[in-house]
């Protein structure tokens, strides 16, 4: 009985440790996207277009352009045109039309998460 219980526990742990979230990052390298975020308790929406080399973001009647440097299929660095500190993005999981990501200022440990939806 003890061996049977250990075997069942082993199978259960093996099955759960093998789970990996879906990451079809290449599907989200380029395209048009929306991203909702919160500032001081107010929900805001940003739209951006990303190409292999650039990201153009439209938010609050402003346009911000940044260069994109891909580290691998799931990670990239954005450098804004105003030469602010670069931001590192990592795609954590994907669905058919969206991806969950984390981002942080390069060199800083504090990370935030978000979800972007592909609109095209």
How would you describe each model-predicted region?
Residues 1-4:
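Positively charged n-region of N-terminal signal peptides that target proteins for export
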Residues 14-17:
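C-terminal motif of bacterial Sec signal peptides marking the signal peptidase cleavage site
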Residues 19-21:
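Bacterial signal peptide processing site
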